[in-house]
Amino acid sequence: MAPSLSPGPAALRRAPQLLLLLLAAECALAALLPAREATQFLRPRQRRAFQVFEEAKQGHLERECVEELCSREEAREVFENDPETDYFYPRYLDCINKYGSPYTKNSGFATCVQNLPDQCTPNPCDRKGTQACQDLMGNFFCLCKAGWGGRLCDKDVNECSQENGGCLQICHNKPGSFHCSCHSGFELSSDGRTCQDIDECADSEACGEARCKNLPGSYSCLCDEGFAYSSQEKACRDVDECLQGRCEQVCVNSPGSYTCHCDGRGGLKLSQDMDTCEDILPCVPFSVAKSVKSLYLGRMFSGTPVIRLRFKRLQPTRLVAEFDFRTFDPEGILLFAGGHQDSTWIVLALRAGRLELQLRYNGVGRVTSSGPVINHGMWQTISVEELARNLVIKVNRDAVMKIAVAGDLFQPERGLYHLNLTVGGIPFHEKDLVQPINPRLDGCMRSWNWLNGEDTTIQETVKVNTRMQCFSVTERGSFYPGSGFAFYSLDYMRTPLDVGTESTWEVEVVAHIRPAADTGVLFALWAPDLRAVPLSVALVDYHSTKKLKKQLVVLAVEHTALALMEIKVCDGQEHVVTVSLRDGEATLEVDGTRGQSEVSAAQLQERLAVLERHLRSPVLTFAGGLPDVPVTSAPVTAFYRGCMTLEVNRRLLDLDEAAYKHSDITAHSCPPVEPAAA
């Protein structure tokens, strides 16, 4: 057991410590720090305050417990507090057990005892997170680096949990620290916390062929309407809208766009949305009422008669025929009376607007013409009377022809006298006439009387068949009802007089129109071998490329519009459409105003070259419509409805001379527009 120390020397040893403690306390009170700094540095400052005592303590420890063997009470006198004593003394005994008593003079014992008061040896703090370890009275304090916490500085501080660590966008926590980053499309600013947009469009290759638009944090590659961006190819590729089923009927895709087509021949056109179809309806009312007491002579385009009568009499009988007649047609057959073509007969016809009589008696034929011009559209009464040796033709009761004849029209056969009478045609081919004539006659007959007898059979037939009836009121012109067409075989190539020079071509069209509907083909060329439409002029109620509803006249080669011109198609007035095409030139005019070209100069030359190639092969000229062609063959395939006269290459087209004409088209008469309601 260690010898006890006397009180006197111990008290003397504690006096300097007390004096230093009072001085240190005075200094600590004089220095005032902010709360945060005081918290961080309170423990280190306490450590420094005890530094003098620690040095003194180390000297006492050397004398009391290293050079000599000390008791717990003596150790308490060295440390002057229980915590450090409680920490020191058990370990002091461990040093004795390990190295022997102080009296063995083992250097390891001295080192072991001298290190026991420093609780930072060995360092209990986490090496990674600790800035310094501070020894305290029986304890220690770990001063943590920024970003670390906990008693041993081994706990990471999550700076991102408070106000996102001060980062504008993304905060990344990591052991002992953190860093800011930005979303895609942004880059970190020099302050390390805020973000600024990256202009991806500064790179010319960002979108390749497409237009680049910078966006906050991103960018977009833009294409024109009708195109979609391909990120793999970095290019704009056409969108096939037809695969999306946008059109009600026929869809045609084109680069950046598409067009819908409707069955024009079926009476349909594009509706307002340019995708669906609607009926083509009249926009101008025409006076198409018909008279049940009239007989239309032009119904049969073939020239065959509209009425055939056969009279049989027991006694010799003479022909008497009277009727009212109206026409604008200058040529055609009114009636035939007689036997077969090699026997006796007469034909009453019109030529150049005047009555003409062809007759054949006993194999001898004659032709005579006389009287006023009667194709003025007014009603007049015409009569044919067979006398003993004469034929008398009267107009409005005035005799215009009196012709001596040798024989009778009624011919005896098997005990009866026979007479064939046909109206609007002859019972044989017109080439067998005395003088050939176009038999087709757009004329109207009423109040007919044959052989002074009442003809109820014909009247009843006409009454129930509107196609045999005439319009109640007509004007000069040709009427297209919207249900058919006519066509001609015309040649548009011209060979110059100079031998050896190349042939040239020309297409000039003048159309006088008074439309009843806003859609329909006025004029067109058709190549039968290719089933193509080399040229067309038509009314249309929309602009195909602008997808805008507008009343227009369109001039096109095949499906490509060369020129467009606005027209007030539904005003009930007559308009003049003029078209001129030749090598290097294509013009369209409406009422003297030139239309707008829809193609470049190079495209025009290419289209005209296509037209010329077609003109060097057989083509047919169509009026009022097209044959059964694909709806994509031309901008318009619908039939025209309204009045129209056509002049082609300075020649007036006579529908009676067409190679074909729909029976509902009237060649030389047209109903007027109905007067506006009062």
UniProtKB/Swiss-Prot annotation:
PROSITE patterns linked: ASX_HYDROXYL (PS00010), EGF_1 (PS00022), EGF_2 (PS01186), EGF_3 (PS50026), EGF_CA (PS01187), GLA_1 (PS00011), GLA_2 (PS50998), LAM_G_DOMAIN (PS50025)
Main location: secreted
Keyword Acyltransferase: no
Resulting phenotype, Y660A: Reduces affinity for AXL 3-fold
Domain of life: Eukaryota
Residue ranges of domain EGF-like in the record: 116-154, 156-196, 197-237, 238-278
Gene Ontology biological-process entries: activation of protein kinase B activity; animal organ regeneration; apoptotic cell clearance; B cell chemotaxis; blood coagulation; calcium ion transmembrane transport; cell surface receptor signaling pathway; cell-substrate adhesion
UniProt-recorded name of the protein: Growth arrest-specific protein 6
Function of the protein: Ligand for tyrosine-protein kinase receptors AXL, TYRO3 and MER whose signaling is implicated in cell growth and survival, cell adhesion and cell migration. GAS6/AXL signaling plays a role in various processes such as endothelial cell survival during acidification by preventing apoptosis, optimal cytokine signaling during human natural killer cell development, hepatic regeneration, gonadotropin-releasing hormone neuron survival and migration, platelet activation, or regulation of thrombotic responses. (Microbial infection) Can bridge virus envelope phosphatidylserine to the TAM receptor tyrosine kinase Axl to mediate viral entry by apoptotic mimicry. Plays a role in Dengue cell entry by apoptotic mimicry. Plays a role in Vaccinia virus cell entry by apoptotic mimicry. Plays a role in ebolavirus and marburgvirus cell entry by apoptotic mimicry.
Organism: Homo sapiens
Listed result of changing L620A: Reduces affinity for AXL 15-fold and decreases activation of AXL
Molecular-function GO terms, alphabetical: calcium ion binding; cysteine-type endopeptidase inhibitor activity involved in apoptotic process; phosphatidylserine binding; protein-macromolecule adaptor activity; receptor ligand activity; receptor tyrosine kinase binding; signaling receptor binding
Glycosylation site residues: N420
UniProt modification remark: Gamma-carboxyglutamate residues are formed by vitamin K dependent carboxylation. These residues are essential for the binding of calcium.
Result after altering F487A: Decreases activation of AXL
UniProt keyword list: Calcium, Disulfide bond, EGF-like domain, Gamma-carboxyglutamic acid, Glycoprotein, Growth regulation, Host-virus interaction, Metal-binding, Phosphoprotein, Repeat, Secreted, Signal
Localization annotation: Secreted
